[in-house]
Amino acid sequence: DAIVDADGAWTVTLEPLDAGGPYRMTVSETSEAATRESLSHDVYAGEVFICAGQSNMEYQMEFLHWRYPSEFTREADSLLRHCKVPVRFDFHGPRHEFDEPVQWVGAASDTLDEFTGIGYFFGRMIRESFGVPVGLLNITLGGSPIESWMDEETLAAWPRMLTDLAPYRNDDEARVRNESSIEARTRWHEDLRV
């Protein structure tokens, strides 16, 4: 059943599905004017794990190629899937949409570089142990302070944190600080490349 609120945000609850895939899913939207359908062909049911955190969780397989070269020559596994949530800074509240397309990709030699290393080995172990599809939702940002993962209501218990974050309410100031941070992070990633 689907539930749609006054702002158009929606939630859908599915009956339990047998682990496996790929399945096809059709989503229909009916309005006074017409009915629209959207069909997805690449849908799997199984276990989904959130891989969240800082640099240790973010550390990509790309940087582990020298240590685990055989992982990059393994047979592709479309049932071990990864989705990297793009990093976007927003100091005005939670985001409900992405600015760019986001997709799930199966583990293969041409996609493995982007997988979180910890997530990949964990997911592969679960796949081998239970034989079900595994999805890894990668929500990571190296060097991010814990406060950046907390909502404003929680941070209210530490007024100093809210004071420190106040300059970021100005979009121009936030952009300048974020660009500087991203440049430093990019340099760090370049230094890691072997």
Which residue stretches match the model-derived regions?
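Cell-envelope and extracellular/periplasmic
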Residues: 1-194
